[in-house]
A protein has these predicted regions:
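Conserved glycine-rich Rossmann-like NAD(P)H-binding loop of the short-chain dehydrogenase/reductase
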Residues: 28-45
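Conserved glycine-rich cofactor-binding loop
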Residues: 14-16
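Active-site helix of classical SDR
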Residues: 122, 158
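C-terminal helical subdomain
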Residues: 182, 204-241
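The beta1-alpha1 cofactor-binding region of Rossmann-like NAD(H)/NADP(H)-dependent oxidoreductases
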Residues: 39-40, 61-72, 104
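Substrate-binding pocket helix/loop in short-chain dehydrogenase/reductase
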Residues: 98-99, 106-111
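Residue(s) in the substrate-gating loop at a strand-loop-helix junction
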Residues: 142
Length: 265
């Protein structure tokens, strides 16, 4: 990588918010290391980004739900002399539906990637940032992290973990030179949401105004990450809903999200 430019590592970079963030970071002159399972999409994205913005891009196809994947990634990058200045911890998977209708292996896959894989990436890259007294972390949670969501029960629970760990880590690292930002987007027009729309008539019927633009979300996330803002909720409606949920008794929030969740099944 270039000695003059900083490098961002983006997981889940082959589509959705991860891909959009790759374009935004490239616009601002960052070299990047892109990680995802789909090697073909990573290669295509890397070629397009490098050609348009004259940045250096490394691709590392891998499945971060595998227990040793984060350690293998860290070891390879260390051996190659690559420094990670900014970590975008975005890789995740979503399964929509009633809890009992989702296969046990799909619940496990969400926990393995959204919780275990997410944590392993942090554990292998944050210590080096702290040692250098410089770095930024952008963890991708969800607006679903703020309350339980029937029909997305396991997914929302994993994102609550992401938000909780992000907030705790932000405080632990206060004054260290390393900032931690939790991105909590609402429903965003990504491949993941498109799959949910295919599975659920209720999701398909969501008003267009409730579905965020992925590029807009990525730009808000970039700005918050640069500032070191602990939590960012893109979109006025999403932010208002989040603030309202935090001020509402939990039993009522559960009842309301239950009604909404059943309407999307």
């Amino acid at each position: 990588m270039s000695e003059e430019r900083e490098t961002v590592l983006i997981t889940g970079a082959s589509s959705g918010i991860g891909e959009a963030l790759a374009w935004v970071f490239a616009e601002h002159g960052y070299d990047m290391i892109l990680v995802a399972r789909n090697a073909q999409k990573l290669d295509e994205l890397a070629d397009e980004v490098a050609a348009k913005h004259d940045v250096m891009v490394i691709v590392r196809p891998m499945d971060l739900s595998e227990p040793d994947s984060a350690s293998n990634l860290a070891r390879v990058l260390h051996r190659e002399g690559e420094r990670v200045d900014i970590l975008v911890n975005n890789a995740g998977v979503l399964e929509h539906g009633a809890f009992i209708d989702i296969a046990p292996e799909d619940h496990q896959r969400m926990v393995q990637l959204n919780v275990a894989g997410f944590t392993n990436v942090l554990a292998h890259f944050v210590p080096d940032m702290v040692a250098r007294e410089a770095g930024k972390v952008l963890n991708v949670a969800s607006i679903g992290a703020f309350q339980p969501i029937p029909s997305l029960a396991t997914y929302a629970a994993t994102k609550a973990y992401v938000l909780s760990l992000s907030e705790a880590l932000a405080e632990e690292l206060r004054g260290s030179g390393v900032s931690v930002t939790a991105l909590c987007p609402g429903v965003t027009q990504t491949h993941m949401v498109e799959e949910a729309q295919e599975q659920s008539e209720g999701v398909r019927k969501l008003p267009r105004m409730m579905i965020g633009d992925v590029e807009t979300v990525a730009r808000e996330a970039f700005r918050a990450c640069m500032k070191g803002t602990p939590i960012v909720v893109p979109g006025t409606l999403n932010l208002a809903g989040t603030l309202a949920a935090r001020a509402t008794p939990k039993w009522l929030v559960r009842r309301l999200t239950g009604l909404m969740g059943r309407s999307t099944l």
